[in-house]
Amino acid sequence: DCFDILVNFENINIYAPLSYGDKKYADSIKHIGIARFGNKFIALESFMRFDEYIAFLNNIDIAIFKQNRQQAMGNIFVLLALGKKIYLDSATTHYDFLTKLGFRVFDIANFNLEPMLEVDSMHNKNLLLKLYSKEKQIENQRSFYL
């Protein structure tokens, strides 16, 4: 599905994290990706150190999460903190969760390569800090136990 969305775009590189999960599935994704996109498809098959992975995420422009289950929320939150444009399937619980919180994420049905507006990027960064700051976490823990 995701590959069908990207096939018509020329000046892109596609990075596919395949270092976790089922190896057979990862191999099939790699094979299909290379067949459809050639050297524009880069399979990430080994784990990176945390600092390397954050640097990698900081260098991408757009992230697409085309799964129907709530997965990769840690990556999504890091990408929000980095001000990246995130596409999700609007029929998923994580799309619903994030939009109800007020994050500006995008429906994959409307995919384009337009850059993230700075105002949207800053909104997401500030909202993330507001909702998940150390102070907010302490407040949440206190209210839970009182």
Language model segments and positions:
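Short hydrophobic signal-anchor/transmembrane segments that target glycosyltransferases
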Residues: D1-I12
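Nucleotide-activated donor-binding/catalytic signature segment of Leloir-type glycosyltransferases, i.e.
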Residues: S28-F47
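Conserved active-site histidine-acidic residue motif and adjacent donor-binding/catalytic loop
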Residues: L44-F56, T92
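Short alpha-helical segment that forms part of, or immediately flanks, the ligand-binding pocket
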Residues: I54, G74-L82, Y95-D96
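Acidic donor-binding loop of glycosyltransferase active sites
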Residues: A55-N68
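Short hydrophobic beta-strand element within catalytic cores of glycosyltransferases
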Residues: K85-L88
